[in-house]
Each structure stands twice: as C-alpha cells, then as structure tokens.
C-alpha cells in the first residue's frame, strides 16, 4: 500500500512539473499575430525615420489621415513618435533575434517625403511620391521600388546600403554614395536639368537605364563603378581617380579627367577631346 501511495505521489509530481512547463512555454511563446497601431497625423507626413532591422513597406493611403503601423513583434520593442512639421519616427528596441520581422507602414504621403533608415532596415514603397524626396540610408539598409516624380531627389547612402529599382522623373537628381553602397535605377527620365550629380566613393556602384537630356556630372574615386551604358546621356562631365571603372553612353561630348588607373568605356560620343587621361588610365570606345 505504501509503495502504491509513493507511486501516486511521483505521478502527481511529474504531472505538476509537465503542467508548469507547458504553462511557462505558452507564456514565453511569441505572439506572431500581426498587430496594428494607429498613429494620429495632423496634415502631411514629410519625414519618416526608421531605426532597426525591419522589413518595412510604405504604402499610400489617401483615405486616412493617420499612419497605420502593422507589426509582429512585442509592442515593448516599438516606439513611435509623430511631431510637427510632419515627422514620423519609428524605432525598434532590443533588436537581437527579431531580424526579418514585419513592419508595415500605411501613410498618406504623396509629397515632401524624406526617408531615413539605419541599422539594416529594408524598405519597400508603393505609389508615386511627388515634389522633393530625400533619402538617407546607412548601416546596410535598403530601399526598394521607389518612384519619385515632379521634383528633386537627393540620395545619401553609406555603410553598404542599397537602393534597387528606383524610378525618377524630374529635373534635379543628386546622389552621394559611399562605403560600398549601390544605387540601381529602373528608369530615370530628365528632359530638362537644373542639376544632376552623382558622386561615388570607396567601391560604391551606380547603375541603371533611362535618358538624361542634359549634362550630368559623374565623380568617382577608390575603385567605384558606373554601369550606365543603358542611360542615354546628352553630354557628360567626368572626374575619376583611383581605379574607377565606368561605362557610359553619350550622344554628344564627354569632358573631364581620368587618373590613377581609372577606365572609361563609352558609346556614341562625338567629341572626347576635352578628356585628360594620365599614364595609368585609359578611355575606350565601344562600337
């Protein structure tokens, strides 16, 4: 009888331990349900600041005067702040272990958009953003499928960040790309030009397709690369130094200088007499 009582006690203790473990496991189990948070907005959003390794989707919602945030991480990891004039900040805390989680941001933002992302954020947009757009990416962040029309665009990338499939239709384009960062243009159309300048530093890359009916300025140093055979240029100013490699297509003239092991391959240009090339560099015509 005593042995039977002892066995029953052992069974009850084992059952209690298993039950406690299951309760603890359920308590610790991550809630993967996509949650929503509505952020009241007074007027247009002009600036979006993203910090953290998010997969971010920014879509336009013209029927709502608020920003709707969707996410699948604990709410304690998120801080949002909206302040005038139109600045929305979204920050993630305790970033370890939540890489690849979802952050979707639906906003009414058709103009005056400024995006800043760092610490590995991956941003995708839908819709056409008008007027000016300034984009600042650092810490291996990404911006994908961005479309900007009817204004200027300024891109500043560092820390191996990337912009992929950018569409720009306007008259003022500036890009400052450093630390192995990359910009790829799906389409650029500039029929008139109040400014077009691309600067590459430290093995960065600029590529794409389209047409620029003016004279942009390409500046590159330290092994950077221009892959722009598919961008039809009217003319071009170049300043390359330190092993820069460039492929360009220009219908009129190319002028500027190549130095310290840089190489320029070009198509179509009718006049290259104003390009100075040092003894370590070369310029090659592609038929």
Predicted regions and their residues:
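C-terminal motif of bacterial Sec signal peptides marking the signal peptidase cleavage site
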Residues: 23-27
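Acidic (Asp/Glu) and glycine-rich low-complexity loops/linkers
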Residues: 2, 28-138, 146-158, 165-177, ...
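Short, surface-exposed interaction patches in beta-rich subdomains
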Residues: 166, 181-287
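Sec-dependent signal peptide hydrophobic core
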Residues: 9-20
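N-terminal secretory signal peptides that target proteins for export/translocation
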Residues: 1-10
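Intrinsically disordered, low-complexity segments
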Residues: 12-14, 64, 222
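Short beta-turn/strand-loop junction motif enriched in small, turn-promoting residues
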Residues: 55, 120-122, 140, 160, ...
